[in-house]
Amino acid sequence: MLRYRGVSIWTVRVKAKKNVVLVGPMGTGKTTIGKLLAKELQFEFVDSDREIEARCGADIPWIFDVEGEVGFRGREKSVIADLSQRDAVVIATGGGAVVDPDNQIALKENGFIVYLHTSVEQQYQRTRKDRKRPLLRSEDPLSVLKKLMSVREPIYRSIADLIISTDSKRPKGVVRDIVKTLRASREETVER
């Protein structure tokens, strides 16, 4: 751990931004990378979709079936607002969480935002057999992924403090790159 005048530099950075938030489309590795990153940073890890399921007592496909996407997004907004107020958490968001402007504000205000980018083709390879993704219950899931990416990618990019590709990378390598960037940003925070 780096130190500056006897103070942990990470502590200085945490005061500026309490959390690390992983955003990006489904299939980028937010959950896998988030767990590893939280362990490395000694932070808690929370997957916002799993938190919604825990609070609701039902899985995401059921929520979509019964309440529709609007009902799900309302639950998601509440969870994002709560998680954003916590300290020292790595948050893996659902792919569509950043579409809501209130979620963007909450996450940005209290977190260092990492956009985990992956190609649509890689997303498709990683998600094509997963039946728990309501938005991919389609005759042509690849087209759905392309459409979602065209709408959401500009948002991911606009709120990101760091953009990192997960295509053809191992999760541990992505975590190393994120930690390296966090260390560099901590040094900038101290120098100011």
From Swiss-Prot:
Keyword Nucleotide-binding: yes
GO annotations of cellular component type: cytosol
PROSITE patterns per UniProt: SHIKIMATE_KINASE
GO molecular function, one term: shikimate kinase activity
Keywords assigned by UniProt, alphabetized: Amino-acid biosynthesis, Aromatic amino acid biosynthesis, ATP-binding, Cytoplasm, Kinase, Magnesium, Metal-binding, Nucleotide-binding, Transferase
CC cofactor note: Binds 1 Mg(2+) ion per subunit.
Pathway: Metabolic intermediate biosynthesis; chorismate biosynthesis; chorismate from D-erythrose 4-phosphate and phosphoenolpyruvate: step 5/7
Signal peptide coordinates: none
Binding site for substrate: D49, R73, G95, R152
Residue sites binding ATP per the record: G27, T28, G29, K30, T31, T32, R133
Cofactor(s) listed in the protein's UniProt record: Mg(2+)
Catalytic activity: shikimate + ATP = 3-phosphoshikimate + ADP + H(+)
Record's subcellular location: Cytoplasm
EC number, as in UniProt: 2.7.1.71
Alphabetical list of Pfam families matching this protein: SKI
Protein origin, superkingdom: Bacteria
Gene Ontology terms: biological process: amino acid biosynthetic process; aromatic amino acid family biosynthetic process; chorismate biosynthetic process
Binding annotation for Mg(2+): T31
Subunit structure: Monomer.
Family: Belongs to the shikimate kinase family.
Function: Catalyzes the specific phosphorylation of the 3-hydroxyl group of shikimic acid using ATP as a cosubstrate.
Protein name in UniProt: Shikimate kinase
